Amino acid sequence: MILPDVNVLVYAFRRDIPQHAVCRRWLADVVESDARFGLSPAVLSAVVRITTNLRAFKMPSAVDEAFGFCEDLLCQPHCQIVEPGDRHWSIFKRLCVETDARGSRVTDAWFAALAIEWGCEWITFDRDFARFPGLKWQVPAARAEGQEN
């Protein structure tokens, strides 16, 4: 199962971002497929937070548009809500300790632990995720072209 990062969904939603076309096409392929895909509520809340932020965008998205984008994904029959389970904290702690995660990398470790716990492939443009042992991850375009990291 795949699990997209915040950046992938923000890029798919916002037409004014250079990676929009790649991410929109990738997301359309995911939605049109019958394969299960995961969504983290923490990722979706960050999508709403970022896309509606006047500091991030000269013309931020309306709150109802951002929620509509997220809800369109959540209502797909093959969408799986992915939340931390019993093993998440121990995986998260291990990743933080092993990689000396600090600051914003702690959040990255939290998401990496979520993907590892669920056995998901993390889809992101952030190559810093390569630092987390045991995490399977891909860049959207690379995944579409069959390349692996």
Question: How would you name each of these model-derived features?
Answer:
Residues 112-149:
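Acidic, PIN/NYN-like endoribonuclease modules and their adjacent C-terminal/linker elements
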Residues 36, 78-80, 136:
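Conserved beta-strand segments of alpha/beta enzyme cores
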Residues 1-39, 54-68, 145-148:
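Short, well-structured N-terminal submotif of metal-dependent ribonuclease cores
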Residues 79-123:
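Active-site neighborhoods of divalent-metal-dependent phosphate/nucleic-acid chemistry enzymes
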Residues 38-41, 124-125:
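Short beta-strand segments at enzyme active-site cores
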Residues 73:
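Ligand-binding beta-strand-loop-alpha-helix segment within the catalytic cores
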Residues 5, 108, 126:
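Acidic active-site catalytic centers that drive phospho-/nucleotidyl reactions
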